[in-house]
Design a protein with these regions (language model features):
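Sequence-structural signature of mature extracellular/luminal beta-sheet repeat domains
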Residues: 1-302
Length: 302
């Protein structure tokens, strides 16, 4: 499905129409008609870099914008800011979100040190300043749930809404945060030592947790934590010179206990996958730099 550069996340409305957001700031709608998607139309532009997006109960899009913060976007094109700071400090890298049945929005802020324009430095520095928040629109209240995360990325709610899954990209693992636990309990490890760097994750209606891995792990980046001098040297390089994981297409399907059910890979097809959403026996894929939404038939997966 051709859409334009960087369809990082994907969501659907009740009629089955597809929505995505691009590097240009555009939010697109692809109408589903006669078993096919019609060419996209622009419904809004955030003026930033929209990443995650989900519909709320009012039929508006809640958007995690890396530059502008947490936004509410109407289908008429109005863009309203919900959250753009915490403790009087701007949110630098709002990344992904999920909404519970009561309307509370859980969202990630990847780093307090770096923005989307220079995010690679976060992996070099290993600042581990990512956070996850809960925002209640009915009370206009913002609560910090988890901090000290090495690049907080995708978030997903369990089906019973008792816990939250958080992709910790910099450590190639998934965290679990108990929403009904005692104060100060923090997050625990749900899945460790993933083969790539996890971006978004979605708990699908099929009961499978679909995890998109944007790149394979880089041995150089894996070993930087103990190499202070090398980190310092790399930190002085232009951003475009910094290493990044090998471009590869990789999506994992996990069960509720974190066991791998499906392992979908391609070395030269749709790569740098940022999200994977299952719908009607198909897997819809988003990417940071591709110019189209990928579609994979999964009806024959066992």
């Amino acid at each position: 499905l051709s859409v334009g550069n960087g369809p990082e996340d994907i969501t659907f409305d009740k009629e089955g129409n597809l929505y995505t957001a691009l590097a240009s700031g555009d939010i697109l709608k692809l109408i589903f008609d006669n078993n096919a998607f019609i060419s996209p139309t622009i419904i809004a532009n955030t003026g930033g870099r929209p990443l995650g997006l989900k519909f709320n109960a009012d039929g508006n899009l809640i958007v995690a914008d890396a530059i502008k913060g947490l936004l509410e976007v109407t289908l008429m094109g109005d863009v309203n800011t919900l959250v753009d700071n915490y403790a009087a400090e701007p949110l630098r890298f709002v990344d992904h979100l999920v909404i519970d049945q009561s309307g509370v929005i859980y969202f990630s802020d990847a780093s307090t040190r770096f923005t989307i324009e220079n995010y690679k430095y976060d992996f070099i520095e290993a600042s581990q300043t990512g956070r996850v928040f809960a925002y209640d629109p009915s009370l206009d209240s913002l609560t910090l749930l988890v901090d000290d995360v090495f690049f907080a990325n995708g978030v997903a709610l369990s089906k019973d809404e008792r816990f939250l899954l958080i992709n910790e990209t910099g450590k190639a693992r998934i965290l679990r945060y108990d929403l009904h636990g005692g104060a100060g309990e923090g997050a625990t490890v749900f899945v460790d030592n993933l083969p790539g760097l996890p971006d978004n994750l979605v708990w699908g209606t099929d009961g499978i947790i679909w995890v998109a891995l944007i790149a394979l792990r880089d041995p150089l980046l894996d070993g930087l934590a103990e190499k202070t001098l090398l980190r310092t040297l790399l930190g002085g390089l232009p951003h475009s010179w910094l290493p990044e994981g090998k471009h590869y297409g990789l999506v994992l399907g996990l069960d509720e206990d974190g066991r791998v059910l499906h392992n979908l890979q391609t070395a030269d097809g749709y790569t740098q996958i940022t999200t994977a959403i299952s719908r009607n026996k198909k897997l819809y894929l988003g990417s940071l730099h591709q110019d189209h939404v990928g579609v994979v038939d999964i009806k024959n997966l066992q």
